[in-house]
Curated annotation (Swiss-Prot):
Organism placement in taxonomy: Bacteria, Bacillati, Cyanobacteriota, Cyanophyceae, Synechococcales
Name under which the protein is recorded: Tryptophan synthase beta chain
Xref: PANTHER family: TRYPTOPHAN SYNTHASE, TRYPTOPHAN SYNTHASE-RELATED
Source organism of this protein record: Prochlorococcus marinus (strain AS9601)
Cross-referenced SUPFAM superfamilies: Tryptophan synthase beta subunit-like PLP-dependent enzymes (SSF53686)
Quaternary structure and interacting proteins, as annotated: Tetramer of two alpha and two beta chains.
Name of the gene: trpB
Length: 414
């Protein structure tokens, strides 16, 4: 397990937080590095999102669907057996789970897919494209397209299709066309590249529902804002459950959408530690990992400047994780900024550590988390021994593990 954080890094002002600049940057990260043909679509999307949040009817419709279709609000659950497991002489880490796995479709992804589908309808776009790695964003996008009668095309890497056959079937059952991407490593990065190529060619009729807080502005802000309901509910539920804000928020980070959704309402609450956990794969000292913040450097990928896994010549390197949803060589620009100014901490755990955590949580709490989520649970082994007082820790349980059972069964020899 590796951590990037030092308390000496905390040199930010609250003015640095929460909103991108007019150029779409968080600090030096973000921006719009795209073909000219996409710029009108990005401007249109930015205006549509800005106007939608000011429209009372849009907000009411979104909230109504989040409640009646998605199943929000999701519970804040006290994991008492996990708490007992990590209790030590110095402190009791009281562990709470924000149950995004209980959303319709089984993960946090539908918060953003639903919101962007409503934006697409406002813009008159009837054709939807999306990329997916673990398949959860693809399923969420296919779901909302079925709900609103929109044509849906999902790009997915051939390698991820092998790992996530259940979600591929779900997407097809929901009426989506799943396009196999064989280029590159045939994973999430390549699926995203193909989706962007499609968008360039069909920008007049098509909206791209990007699935993470990555890509060109305004996507990082739009995706974050639709997921901020996670953190907003968590803040209210913590006050109801134990009478204060949490001490620590913990979430896995690939592109970083579930983490930003949890973190965003708390970034100005400086008493709350924000911890993101990346995929160390076979180890960060090998060439098989996806620990972008831990080991990356500044570069440009998929229309945005952020931290990337790249070689000395600026060529993007392959990422590796047992978790298809974390198998990405970049990260959202806001995460890079929060790391730089010391507001958030980032660590990484290996495939094996994530598998061990998944097994532990399943046995102690009767909850099978997604492999992505298991990376956040694995960080408890590193975090809890360092605590010097009783601490309320909220983990974003970003998805359920049904999709991963074949991978887990073969890896754990069950």
């Amino acid at each position: 397990m590796v951590s990037t954080f030092s308390r000496k890094d905390q040199n930010y002002k609250n003015d640095d937080l929460n909103q991108p600049s007019i150029e779409g940057r968080f600090g030096k990260y973000g921006g719009q590095y795209v073909p000219e043909t996409l710029m009108p679509a990005l401007f249109e999307l930015e205006d549509a999102a800005s106007n939608a949040w000011k429209d009372k009817l849009f907000v009411e419709e979104l909230n109504h669907l989040l409640k009646t279709y998605v199943g929000r609000e999701t519970p804040l659950y006290e994991a008492k057996r996990l708490t007992e497991h990590y209790k030590n002489k110095q402190a009791t880490p009281r562990i709470w789970l924000k149950r995004e796995d209980l959303n319709h479709t089984g993960a946090h992804k539908i918060n953003n897919a639903l919101g962007q589908a409503l934006l697409a309808i406002r813009m008159g776009k009837k054709r939807i494209i999306a990329e997916t790695g673990a398949g959860q964003h693809g399923v969420a996008t296919a779901t909302v397209c079925a709900r609103f009668g929109l044509k849906c095309i999902i790009y997915m890497g051939a390698e991820d299709i092998k790992r996530q056959s259940l979600n591929v079937f779900r997407m097809k059952l929901l009426g989506a066309e799943v396009k196999v991407v064989n280029s590159g490593t045939a994973t999430l990065k390549d699926a995203t590249s193909e989706a962007i190529r499609d968008w360039v060619s069909n920008v007049e009729t098509t909206h791209y529902i990007l699935g993470s807080v990555a890509g060109p502005h305004p996507f990082p802000k739009i995706v974050r804002d639709f997921h901020a309901v996670i953190g907003e509910e968590t803040k209210k539920q913590c006050l109801e459950s134990f009478g204060s804000l949490p001490d620590i928020l913990l979430a896995c980070v690939g592109g970083g959408s579930n983490a930003m959704g949890l973190f965003h309402p708390f970034v100005k609450e400086t008493s709350v530690r924000l911890i993101g956990v990346e995929a160390a794969g076979s180890g960060v000292d090998t060439d098989k990992h996806a620990a972008t913040i831990t080991k990356g450097s500044v570069g440009i990928l998929h229309g945005s400047m952020s931290l990337l896994l790249q070689d000395d010549n600026g060529q993007v390197q392959e990422a590796h994780s047992i978790s298809a949803g974390l198998d990405y060589p970049g990260v959202g620009p806001e995460h890079s900024h929060l790391k730089d100014i010391g507001r958030a901490e980032y660590g990484s755990v290996t495939d094996q550590e994530a598998l061990d955590a998944l097994k532990l949580v399943s046995e102690l709490e009767g909850i099978i988390p997604a492999l992505e989520t298991a990376h956040a649970f694995a960080w408890l082994d590193k975090l809890c021994p360092t605590l010097e007082k009783d601490t309320n820790i909220v983990i974003n349980c970003s998805g359920r593990g049904d999709k991963d059972v074949n991978t887990v069964a073969s890896s754990l020899d069950i």
